[in-house]
């Protein structure tokens, strides 16, 4: 029985117009293919990556509307003696959905949909430091907020901080460049100087770079409705925002004080991300070329069946400390080949000999973990006799004449 369920959705796009399809609809493509119609695939996966439940929705289905149906079906199709934990991402974690999970008898772990402000930190509380598998340094710290009953965990990542800082600097420099252009035009002969026009230009710059503009106070100095100067100063809140770069908040209704346990449970959602990546990339789930909805459903269901086989193999390998992706497994095992040699003997008969090449050490390691033989067969020999050759030639000749 599973104690943790990971729930998420993905979508894949169609090639073609799909005019008569009920499934295909325009929506928010996770692959940025806004020009194509989509179909949505919802999966519930356990921490070992095995699919416990799946459903297919129309392409315009939003993430946060699917949970009620999934939870009801999951309850009827799985047996749970203990209270299970559902891990979801921010797109699904609306207040209504979190309330629904509690009512249905589930605990939840999710990322807060927005950055939590005005929180307090226990001065005597502990800050945990750890290194992730991809060599990212993170800190874990419990925080509290008034009227918030959930356990809140602040997670700060150096990798995420560097990325967000670079993006902030990029947009900020572009915003200031726009403001400087507007100010420079005030001193040009044919530049825009009318105050209302200058305000419009500043408004467009703010609309274009809202994430950077919110940290600046901008004032236009006027004389007789003519702008003479633009004064912009940086707000103090910008420094406070810099301190929060790279941080996100995990919330849960679990009764726990273990920061590492909460983060580990939430981090297991990487497994469902790996599932979607395997389905789309390794098993060619995307794009979909089928014309009718029945063929589309078959395509998606066959992809899920193929994933079951892939994950079973990967699960067995992981138990032996082999953590390769499916792409890497196939690359390694494809180094062993079957070689077919043929020639004619004195009786003019064709002789075929098939042999397997020697597997390298990496292949042997995978075979040993899966309890496979190093060779599917040692040597196979077959002979095509003269009578069979003549018969085949006669049949081929008659087919040619008939055609």
Language model region names:
Residues 1-403:
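Anion-binding and metal-coordination hotspots
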């Amino acid at each position: 029985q599973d104690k943790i369920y990971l729930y998420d959705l993905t979508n894949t796009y169609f090639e073609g117009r799909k005019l008569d399809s009920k499934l295909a609809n325009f929506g928010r493509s996770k692959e940025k293919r806004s020009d194509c119609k989509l179909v949505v695939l919802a999966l519930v996966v356990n921490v070992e990556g095995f699919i416990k439940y799946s459903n297919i929705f129309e392409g315009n289905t939003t993430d946060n509307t699917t949970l009620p149906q999934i939870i009801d079906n999951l309850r009827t199709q799985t047996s749970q003696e203990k209270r299970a934990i559902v891990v979801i991402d921010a797109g699904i974690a609306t207040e209504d959905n979190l309330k629904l999970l509690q009512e249905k008898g589930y605990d939840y772990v999710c990322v807060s949909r927005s950055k939590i402000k005005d929180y307090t930190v226990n001065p005597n509380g502990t800050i945990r430091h750890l290194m992730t598998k991809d060599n990212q340094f993170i800190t874990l710290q419990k925080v509290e907020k008034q009227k918030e009953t959930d356990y809140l965990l602040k997670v700060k990542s150096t990798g995420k901080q560097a990325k967000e800082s670079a993006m902030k600097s990029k947009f900020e420099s572009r915003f200031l460049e726009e403001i400087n252009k507007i100010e420079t035009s005030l001193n040009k002969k044919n530049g825009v100087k009318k105050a209302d026009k200058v305000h419009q230009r500043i408004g467009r710059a703010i609309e274009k770079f809202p994430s950077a503009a919110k940290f600046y106070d901008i004032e236009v100095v006027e004389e007789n409705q003519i702008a003479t100067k633009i004064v912009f100063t940086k707000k103090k809140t910008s420094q406070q925002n810099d301190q929060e770069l790279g941080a996100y908040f995990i919330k849960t209704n679990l009764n726990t004080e273990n920061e590492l346990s909460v983060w580990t449970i939430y981090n297991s959602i990487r497994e469902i991300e790996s599932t979607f990546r395997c389905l789309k990339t390794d098993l060619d789930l995307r794009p979909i070329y089928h014309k009718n909805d029945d063929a589309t459903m078959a395509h998606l269901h066959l992809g899920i069946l193929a994933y079951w086989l892939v994950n079973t193999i990967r699960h067995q390998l992981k138990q032996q400390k082999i953590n390769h992706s499916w792409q890497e497994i196939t690359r390694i095992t494809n180094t062993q080949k079957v070689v077919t040699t043929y020639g004619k003997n004195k009786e003019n008969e064709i002789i075929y000999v098939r042999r397997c090449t020697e597997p390298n050490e990496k292949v042997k390691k995978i075979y040993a973990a899966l309890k496979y033989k190093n060779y599917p067969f040692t040597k196979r020999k077959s002979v095509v006799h003269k009578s069979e050759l003549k018969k085949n030639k006669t049949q081929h000749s008659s087919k040619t004449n008939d055609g």
